[in-house]
Amino acid sequence: MIVTGATNVKSTELSETARAKVNLTLRVVGRRADGFHDLESVVAFADCVDRLTLMPGTDLSLVAGGPRAQECGQAADNLVLKAARLLGERVANLTTGVFALDKHLPVAAGIGGGSADAAAALRLLARANGIAIGDPRLIEAARLTGADVPVCVCSEACVMTGVGETLQPLGLPAMPAVLVNPRVPVATKDVFAALGLRKGELHVGVSDVIEAIVWPKTGAPMNDWLAMLADGTNDLEPPAIRVQPVIGEVLARLRATGARLSRMSGSGATCFAIFGNEADARNAAQTIRLDRPQWWVHAGTLS
């Protein structure tokens, strides 16, 4: 059950933030025989968040509030409840309770909003039940909830491969950035359909695999990272623009700000731009807000 309304936090509740996920690069290696796509992605996390709290109890439910509460969908489709149920199938006598979601991140936006919420739910249930984050039962529940949920459980910069299950931590520095979403939802399945890979078809060569890349060490300057990231791409960007042409406009406006790097995240429609300093990021965000007040714009950091 999902109820929309106020989400008053009580002192006995547990709380977690759900950070937006940003794909700095995204290669589609190919489509497997089972229909899933193997991916290679450098993932960072932004400082824009949803907030999720848990009042531990016996009955599982979700109360949604915040400016995007109406976008949480039906209970059968909500990833917070799905993750909790999947963990409950694997952990006997799991304490669940009432989740309260303060929803701010856009949905169907390529920044893992629903996945980040589900990951926060798993972290809350782990705390409420004394389960380690690395517990195989929790990891399996995360994987079955959705491809982006395992990386969102960790919520730290990494290289993500496979169907999202293999994670390699990265020492990414904090990078000033702007995120822009034109408030147009994009269905991931539509973008992959537009990519058009057949089952068993490869999209990149063996020599392109991301595991072979030697990434900068922790503490390396941002310029070193930007040089590496600039060599990357998002393979879903062209098909996403075919599905929603406004994504091309978002990218054009970001690139016109003088950003160091601009790209689409995930399957869209959110795009990001990285800047040399926070002032430039704030100025770019303000310019875009004034020009396109209907768009969602966030200036902050990626790390």
From Swiss-Prot:
Function: Catalyzes the phosphorylation of the position 2 hydroxy group of 4-diphosphocytidyl-2C-methyl-D-erythritol.
Tagged with keyword DNA repair: no
SUPFAM superfamilies named in the record: GHMP Kinase, C-terminal domain, Ribosomal protein S5 domain 2-like
Record-given protein name: 4-diphosphocytidyl-2-C-methyl-D-erythritol kinase
Database matches in PANTHER family: 4-DIPHOSPHOCYTIDYL-2-C-METHYL-D-ERYTHRITOL KINASE, CHLOROPLASTIC (PTHR43527:SF2)
Lineage: Bacteria, Pseudomonadati, Pseudomonadota, Alphaproteobacteria, Hyphomicrobiales
Reactions catalysed, as given in the entry: 4-CDP-2-C-methyl-D-erythritol + ATP = 4-CDP-2-C-methyl-D-erythritol 2-phosphate + ADP + H(+)
Binding sites annotated in the UniProt record for ATP: P106, V107, A108, A109, G110, I111, G112, G113, G114, S115, A116
